[in-house]
Curated annotation (Swiss-Prot):
Lineage start: Bacteria, Bacillati, Actinomycetota, Actinomycetes, Bifidobacteriales
Record carries keyword Ribosomal protein: yes
Family of the protein in this entry: Belongs to the bacterial ribosomal protein bL28 family.
Pfam families (alphabetical): Ribosomal_L28
Keyword set, alphabetical order: Ribonucleoprotein, Ribosomal protein
Disulfide linkage: none
MF-aspect GO terms: structural constituent of ribosome
Organism of origin: Bifidobacterium animalis subsp. lactis (strain AD011)
GO cellular component, one term: ribosome
Name of the molecule in the record: Large ribosomal subunit protein bL28
Amino acid sequence: MAARCAVCGKGPQTGYTVSHSHIRNKRRFLPNLQPVRTTVDGQNVRLRVCTKCLKAGKVQRVKVA
């Protein structure tokens, strides 16, 4: 499953992990995705949304009984 936000499209970025001796190793920084139940076109669906979109209120959660 792709590490991509369903709302804003934020995906992984590349960079380095740097040790104390400054040896650099390539790595991927993944977005903090959370599964959220929301309503899309009148149907309850489960989306993977980044926490930045959740905090900004771009997604309304659905209460599941």
